[in-house]
Each structure stands twice: as structure tokens, then as C-alpha cells.
A protein has these predicted regions:
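Active-site-adjacent "gating/activation" loops or surface patches in catalytic cores
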Residues: 184-201, 238, 308-375
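A well-structured
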Residues: 1-322
Length: 375
């Protein structure tokens, strides 16, 4: 994406562990298999969890692993080219099929799981499979007050591809396609933001801030506002229907943390963040020789900042040495990830912004981990 070669251009992942390509017929075969699996799951276990919970958990795990294989593969593929029409079409087709069939056949499972009485569940824990999944079961039962009727849960799952998730994907595509013109060259948002944080020229930073502001105005800002409205609105309505007391409650419960702990963190950040920020910017202005920072100076590099371009291979060596110093096991996992080509590193136009690691368990209980970067 930038003109600086770092060696990251050659670091691309190999997704052959899952499929050979977007046209691999095994993708459709796996989707068809999932459809049959969820239908059989409902027939075998609906209304029978008091006697079949162990087998149900095993079957549900198989469904989740195969679903993960399909969906994670497509997500990884889309990350390197967000607007690729063929990938978008495939994702849409898969989502519509799976959400329809999952919505029709799976909602009963969690609803009936949380409805099991304590005495019945205590007996079921004699099954090694059920006992192994006890933390997962208890966590699911923690949400018992918030489940809706089965027909409602079914409808929500079926319409999921056409709601907030779709708007989020739409925004990612808009952001990846956004072009900002700077001194005659068209650049991506990620590139100009990077330049803004690295430029030591105050006039250049001011110019970059202006072109970024212009680029974010107009149609992009309207679509961004509409996306936020749809996502927040969808979440707000569902939270009320599920009787959550406030927007953070579902996340806090999912993280198994009390509201009071999160509130304490928020309060400390609110009370101390402002003064610390002002202190930091006063110190930064002094280092830059300025009485007052302009908006475009907020992320300016310090005069003593090292602007050396670090080749990807050297950066990876540093990471490995750091992990090796406290956990040879973790260092070994990273080294294995490099050897098996599980990293996609270059910063290029059209890629998803940011970085992430996606770890999953594939069918056959095969662990896999993929790392996405914009180096």
C-alpha cells in the first residue's frame, strides 16, 4: 500500500488446510452436510435433552466445527479483498442458507438446555461428555432470563443476514474502497492516517488532516451515520426484548464479569483520563517546541522518535525472541504459524483495516490459527 517494501509483501497465508479456493466444490458439499446435520440434530434431540444431552453436545460440537471451517475460510478470504464480488456473493449465499436452516432447527437446543432443572442436570453430569462441558453449560444457563420464545429466536436467526451484520459488512467495504487524494496521488484511509502519524513536517500534517476530513465528508459520512444508526438501533431493540437492563449487560455477562467492576473501570477512566491526557499533550507540545498543539499535531512523532523502517523479517525475529524469553511453548506456536503459512502480512489497497488473529477448531478437533496484518 505504501511505496516502502518491508518484505511483508511476500508473507501470504495458505488456506489450503480448509479449501483449495473459492471454487472448491467441497464448500458447497460442506454447506449441504451442515443442512442435513442440523435437521438430524433437531429430530434426535428436541424434547429429549434430559436423556440425550451428552450426544447432543457432541453433535452440536461437530456442527460448530464444520460451520467454522466454512465461515472462517470465507472471512479470511474476504479480509484480503473486502470488495471482491465473487467472495461477497459466496458469503451471502452461505449465510442465507445456514441462517435459514440453523434458525429452523437449532434454537430449541439452548432454550431447552437452560430449562433443565438442577436435579436432572446433576444426574447428567455423570456423563463424562456433559461433565467436560460443565463450564459451558453453566455459562449458557446464566442467560436463561434473556432467551425469547423459540419462534422468535428462530426468526431472529433467519433474518440475521439482512440486519446489523449486513450493514457492518457494507461499511467495511466502503472504508476499504475509500480513496483520499494527497498531492496528486490517490491513497487509502489507512495510508494517509499512517502518514499523519509519521510526518515530522507540521505543514504536511495540517494538509493531511484537511484532505482526510474532506475524504470522510459527503457520501461516506452519510453511509457511516446510517450504518451506526442501524447497528445501534437493532442492538437496542433486541436488548430491550431480552430484558437486559443496560447496553453493557450482555457483554459483561458474556465476559463473566460483574457490572460493578466495569462501572468502576469506566469511572476511573472518566475521572483520571482527562487530566492525564491534558498533561500528556502539554508535555508533547514542549517536546515539539510549541506553545499549543494544533489538531494535526496530536499524533505527530516526537523529535527523538526512531523512524527507521523495520523489515518484516527483523520484526518477526524480535517477536520470536520476546516470546522465547518467557514462553518457549508460545514461541514454538508462532514459529509453527510462520512455517505453515498462517500469516497474511502486506498492507494493500482493498484489505480489511487493522489486524487480528482468528483461532478455530476444525472438524476432527484440529486446532488452527490465522493472523492478519497490515504491515
Amino acid at each position: 500500500m505504501t511505496n516502502t517494501n518491508t518484505g511483508a509483501e511476500k508473507v501470504r497465508w495458505d488456506l489450503g488446510l480448509m479449501y483449495s479456493g473459492l471454487d472448491d466444490p467441497q464448500i458447497d458439499a460442506d454447506v449441504a452436510a451442515l443442512v442435513e446435520m442440523v435437521k438430524k440434530f433437531k429430530t434426535s434431540h428436541k424434547g429429549k435433552l434430559s436423556t440425550t444431552l451428552g450426544k447432543a453436545i457432541s453433535g452440536y460440537s461437530e456442527i460448530e466445527m464444520l460451520e467454522g471451517k466454512v465461515k472462517v475460510y470465507l472471512y479470511l478470504l474476504q479480509s484480503i479483498n473486502v470488495a471482491e464480488p465473487a467472495v461477497k456473493t459466496k458469503i451471502a449465499d452461505v449465510d442465507k442458507t445456514l441462517c435459514r436452516e440453523f434458525g429452523e432447527n437449532l434454537p430449541f437446543f439452548r432454550i431447552e438446555l437452560v430449562a433443565l432443572d438442577d436435579a436432572t442436570l446433576a444426574k447428567l453430569y455423570a456423563d463424562p461428555i456433559v461433565a467436560k462441558h460443565r463450564p459451558w453449560i453453566e455459562h449458557a444457563r446464566f442467560f436463561k432470563p434473556h432467551f425469547l420464545a423459540e419462534p422468535v429466536e428462530s426468526a431472529l436467526t433467519k433474518r440475521a443476514p439482512f440486519g446489523a451484520i449486513s450493514w457492518g459488512d457494507f461499511f467495511d467495504e466502503l472504508e476499504a474502497d475509500l480513496e483520499i487524494e494527497f498531492r496528486g496521488d490517490k491513497k487509502t484511509l489507512t495510508e494517509v492516517l499512517y502518514m499523519l502519524t509519521k510526518s515530522k513536517d507540521a505543514d504536511e500534517r495540517a494538509e493531511l488532516s484537511r484532505v482526510i476530513a474532506r475524504g470522510l465528508k459527503g457520501p461516506f459520512s452519510k453511509y457511516a451515520a446510517q450504518t451506526l444508526y442501524m447497528v445501534v438501533g437493532d442492538n437496542s431493540v433486541e436488548n430491550r426484548e431480552r430484558t437486559f437492563k443496560h447496553p453493557m449487560e450482555p457483554r459483561n455477562k458474556s465476559n463473566r464479569i460483574q457490572d460493578e467492576v466495569v462501572d468502576a473501570l469506566h469511572n476511573v477512566v472518566r475521572d483520571m483520563g482527562g487530566p492525564l491526557m491534558r498533561r500528556f499533550y502539554r508535555l508533547k507540545a514542549a517536546h515539539l517546541g510549541l506553545k499549543k498543539l494544533k489538531w494535526s499535531d496530536r499524533n505527530a512523532p516526537m523529535p527523538f522518535a526512531d523512524t527507521t523502517v523495520v523489515p518484516f523479517e527483523k520484526a518477526m525475529t524480535t517477536v520470536l525472541e520476546a516470546y522465547e524469553s518467557f514462553s518457549p511453548t508460545l514461541a514454538g506456536l508462532i514459529r509453527k504459524s510462520i512455517e505453515e503459512k498462517r500469516i497474511d502480512a502486506p498492507a494493500e489497497k482493498g484489505r480489511r483495516a487493522g489486524a487480528y488473529n482468528y483461532s478455530i477448531v476444525l472438524p476432527g478437533n484440529i486446532p488452527a490459527s490465522f493472523t492478519f496484518l497490515n504491515y
